[in-house]
Amino acid sequence: MKRLSRSAAPVALLLAAVLLSGCYSTGIDQYFSPPQPSEEYLQLQELIDKELSSGSEYAAPTRGSFRQSVQFTDLDGDGMEEALVFLRGADGTPKINIYLSVNNEYRKVLTLDGEGRSIGSVDFADLDTDGRTDLIVAWQLTGSMSLLSVYSLENWSGELLLSTDSTEYLTGDLNSDGREEILVLRNVSTGTYMADMYTLRPDREPQAASAALSSGIYGLQRLRMVTLADGSPALLAESLLDNGDLVTDVLSWREGSLVNLTLNRSTGISETRRSYSLVYAQDIDGDGVVEIPHPQQLYSQGGELFWSVAWYKYDAFGRAGLDMTTYHCVTDGWYLELPDGWATGLTVRRVDDVPGERAVILSRLGTDGSVHDLVAIYTITGENRIDRARLEGRFLLQEESSTVFAGQVMDNSVDPAAIESRFHRIYSDWSV
């Protein structure tokens, strides 16, 4: 996907530096000259001002990577940047003006009039492999529904290549043909979502392939391209079901069709469905392949429920293989890769009776119902956190600005070094 070389706020902001005043003495000021906007930018601003004076207003895209009212990029591959200006017209409908610079002077070459009340998002990709960038625009119709339009910029024609309803979309090479496709998720009816893959033939005629997502979806959570265990690309969509469960749909291109690899044909819901909805699919081991979480409820020592998470890799035929099992403490922001054999009979309890200190104790449940403690993980805050992390029997796992994590082995067969190497922090990931 082609990305912008740079982005800009409305061009008028370029003049702000001229108006800034400092606290330097006159003797120092004489050696400094505030940056001056070029005549080219001033002339572009004049063109934009004409639009604004006619009743238009800036209307930047509300989602996605490109959210500035004015964006600069080389759309036609000539090495020169064009300016895209995102506006709302006097009638309230959104529009996009494209300005071309010729001999250091801008002129408007294209206006794209949209639908709805705003511009949801924009993106850029060469979908027909003609060497030119195509413009992808999601015109926002309602809170969750967009009209997705793809425009050719050849000779600045603005030819509409594709138009379809969309809830979310992205671009990627799902069929491994070296060309990018548009992958669209759309809400067909309440609880029913479809995934559509659009390709553009050499004659620019769109071709579509579709597959159903899990039934009963309440709302989409995350969407991205991932790599499967056999190296195949896949589209991964994670959603909340209407009962609060989390589900992961994995879609792949197989034998000329778009296939939902994880969908159970009997239930109409992915086999990745889980009531523990705090952990999302990710590359948990850092090998470049996505793993899908399958939580397993642990034996409860009290009222609070705890879960271990088995992580599975999938290939393009939907075959799954266990990669690892973890215990995720989302509350304290860490997880532990469980050593071999720990997942069977594991039980967990939390102890937080010491101010500024929370302990999570992982134990093994005996066949007679007895509990044998293995290791404790401490999350410690407060001014004396370092001292408490180094109390007798404890070892430091990780130190951050206001929090320290420490461990304590409670079984002689457990190696502290193994716990240290298996301890990881939980960091925020992507979202739709």
Please provide the spans of the model-predicted regions:
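Beta-propeller-forming repeat regions
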Residues: 22-364, 382-406, 411, 421-432
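Sec-dependent bacterial lipoprotein signal peptides
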Residues: 1-21
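Histidine-centered catalytic/metal-binding microenvironments
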Residues: 414-415
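A short acidic-to-branched-hydrophobic micro-motif
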Residues: 364-384
